[in-house]
Amino acid sequence: MSSGKVKAGELWNKSKDDLTKQLAELKTELGQLRIQKVASSGSKLNRIHDIRKSIARVLTVINAKQRAQLRLFYKNKKYAPLDLRAKQTRAIRRRLSPDEKSRVLEKTKKRTVHFPQRKFAIKA
């Protein structure tokens, strides 16, 4: 794949096999360019930069697709891996759950039943 930069938009439509093949091609090309750089003058330094960025684009697409598949897999499961859960602050993670908030002690329940809030009528 010695033609220009890789466009990320084109990568999304490719299958996993195509992406891994392209990644292997880019890595071999990068290796060849590094050998050329050592052997002769550094005329292809810009090309090395482009190839490295292209490798990063391909890896980004592969990882994003993989994470999307994992999200689908864990969608209706009780537990999901920490990195797939919605990001929350530490304080929010330590908050009481709605179930824990709604719990009332037996003694408190009895008090509210036996001694309800008094209603006063104001004489006008």
Curated annotation (Swiss-Prot):
Membrane-spanning residues: none
A biological process from GO: maturation of LSU-rRNA from tricistronic rRNA transcript (SSU-rRNA, 5.8S rRNA, LSU-rRNA)
Pfam families reported in the protein's UniProt record: Ribosomal_L29
Keyword Nucleus among UniProt keywords: no
UniProt xrefs under NCBIfam families: L29
Homology family: Belongs to the universal ribosomal protein uL29 family.
Protein name per its UniProtKB record: Large ribosomal subunit protein uL29
Native species: Triticum aestivum (Wheat)
